[in-house]
Amino acid sequence: MAQIDFRKKINWHRRYRSPQGVKTEHEILRIFESDRGRIINSPAIRRLQQKTQVFPLERNAAVRTRLTHSMEVQQVGRYIAKEILSRLKELKLLEAYGLDELTGPFESIVEMSCLMHDIGNPPFGHFGEAAINDWFRQRLYPEDAESQPLTDDRCSVAALRLRDGEEPLNALRRKIRQDLCHFEGNAQGIRLVHTLMRMNLTWAQVGGILKYTRPAWWRGETPETHHYLMKKPGYYLSEEAYIARLRKELNLALYSRFPLTWIMEAADDISYCVADLEDAVEKRIFTVEQLYHHLHEAWGQHEKGSLFSLVVENAWEKSRSNSLSRSTEDQFFMYLRVNTLNKLVPYAAQRFIDNLPAIFAGTFNHALLEDASECSDLLKLYKNVAVKHVFSHPDVEQLELQGYRVISGLLEIYRPLLNLPLSDFTELVEKERVKRFPIETRLFHKLSTRHRLAYVEAVSKLPSDSPEFPLWEYYYRCRLLQDYISGMTDLYAWDEYRRLMAVEQ
């Protein structure tokens, strides 16, 4: 096992215009303060205020959006980071681990990773992801990429259809089709900060949001040693070279994770489990009394002094005894949140320290709060009650189905841009208006300038005389559409769909 030295991981250099001659702790901290400013002031963070946490298109400001959720995750991440550093200081290990002058950057990277952890999520959350992937699967049929004979391939895009005698072009076609059918919010987050927003963050800060290490074009089983780290796509083909450079800069082996990402993940797990239940009470899906009984029933038999007793029952009893000063609802969730944090944060911090050799190497193949402990059972309890009584509620399911229809409908509306032959789409990009393509011209004008420029830049770097050019051009054209639609807020996507379907009231 490699020696633990965080000076080899907390890399403050950037992809472009990297700071030179940095030596002191104060100078290093200023670099990460610059990252904080870039992140907090970015449009991607602002858009989170109109993206779904659990309840799409919610008008009640007391119910969480992705932004308010991310701010809560940021605070929990800060708490865990401080707890880790405090415990390492007590053990006199800060200097041994190269952290004695990097405590500020350590905390800042965790905080900003938490704030950014959802920036790549499309409108309507996981149902938005499913809509994008289903729509592209119905067009590209990635499962046919291994079909024999090749004439069985049902892909509707000529450039990406497999052809006899065209290896290695067929290998690239398989990768592209698989990649485009695996849109994922975490992978889109990497694409946002590097390719679309060009935030030029430090290598360490970007490493903090690389939650999953599986490329989106991966086919087949993942290695047993990395099956948890690779359970979802973490980056796209378009960012392959950037991620390769990131691994080099952060001393990460293939498919390994940056150490501070485990803290961000734990903070997210702790935050959303309680928050989803609180939002459900705010939405009157159930009362606090009903929630308590759901939790009690799901946990089952327990003894006095058990974690359930110390966290949930304690919160219930305290909220009932002080009902005159604040509402029972407010008091119950205040105590539940405090009790949960006071048990789970120290546990997550100790798990991080106990497994630091594997975490530092990036190979710890688990979440900090997924084990056989009571702390893990408590999180599972919150999640299971939410799945059974919140996510399956008719109002929630109806809104999710509407969100799925909106995203699918928008993709269908913009489909003419994908149907244009390469030469015609190139003409449209160059001229921005082509008389014989009135619909496509107007659709193209609606695309964000930022996304159009990202497409132009990517295609301009391709050798136009290469047989791979039509494949890559179509890939980036699909990315253009995915970038645009996934970057919408819930409300904008809803309104845009109604406008373009001519059903605006």
Swiss-Prot record:
Q: How does it assemble?
A: Homotetramer.
The record's listing under InterPro entries reads:
dGTP_triP_hydro_central_sf (IPR023293), dGTPase (IPR006261), dGTPase-like (IPR050135), dNTPase_1 (IPR020779), HD/PDEase_dom (IPR003607), HD_domain (IPR006674)
Which function does this protein serve?
Answer: dGTPase preferentially hydrolyzes dGTP over the other canonical NTPs.
Q: Return the protein name.
A: Deoxyguanosinetriphosphate triphosphohydrolase
- What is the top-level taxon of the source organism? Bacteria
Q: Record keywords: Hydrolase included?
A: yes
Catalytic activity from the UniProt record: dGTP + H2O = 2'-deoxyguanosine + triphosphate + H(+)
Annotated CDD domains = HDc
Write down the SMART domains for this protein, in alphabetical order: HDc
Q: Which cofactor does it need?
A: Mg(2+)
Q: Which family does it belong to?
A: Belongs to the dGTPase family. Type 1 subfamily.
Q: Which gene encodes it?
A: dgt
Q: Which GO terms describe its molecular function?
A: dGTPase activity; magnesium ion binding
Keyword set, alphabetical order: Hydrolase, Magnesium
Q: What is its EC number?
A: 3.1.5.1
**Organism whose genome encodes this protein:** Escherichia coli O6:H1 (strain CFT073 / ATCC 700928 / UPEC)
Q: Where is the HD domain?
A: 66-273
